[in-house]
Amino acid sequence: TRPVFALALDYERRAQKIEILRQIRRFKNWGILRIAVCCKFDGAVKDIPADVMIAVSVPSQYAGFLPSDLSEYRGRRLHLLGGTPIQWLDLIPKLQGVGATVMSADGSSHETAAKKGTHFEAGKWRNYGKRAEYAHTVVYSGREIVRAVNAVAGSEQRSLFAA
């Protein structure tokens, strides 16, 4: 079996353009359905073919990059990488406002929070000071995150497997 989604190398310097485009072509030749590139400098998005998703490294305490002008994402399909659901809920309307479409997101903050008995509910993190079963808390938070993202996006989150 082959992967459905592939994230190419981070595009951090213009000098990487040929290498990134080769990697995209290789992924396409392998039949990978969804390809994304994380662009990490202003103006990088225009170098990426229109049929390739842009992975947005959501700024967090560890890393992240947003271009100085979000309109660079206009007309592009986006995948949010990292960050927290609260950051996503703030960022999605801004991205939609410039004409981008957020297709998907991934992060692990709900898993980290579950280790502390904290869950995501009604748009915020909650901890009632009671012991919480880890697996249930992760699943519950995941469902609540999808619900919140769909509400702010005004549509259902699309599957990576949809055509």
Task: Give a label for each model feature.
Residues 15-16, 45-47, 63-65, 87-90, ...:
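Short catalytic/ligand-binding loop motif for oxyanion handling, primarily in non-cytosolic enzymes
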Residues 51-79, 88-90:
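Donor nucleotide-activated moiety binding/catalytic core segment of transferases
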Residues 41, 58-60, 82-84, 109:
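Short, flexible loop/turn elements at secondary-structure junctions
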Residues 8, 56, 80, 105-107:
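Conserved beta-strand positions
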Residues 1-59:
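Active-site beta->alpha loop and helix N-cap motifs at the rims of alpha/beta catalytic domains
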Residues 22, 28-29, 71-78, 86-163:
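Alpha/beta catalytic cores of nucleotide-metabolism and tRNA/nucleoside-modifying enzymes
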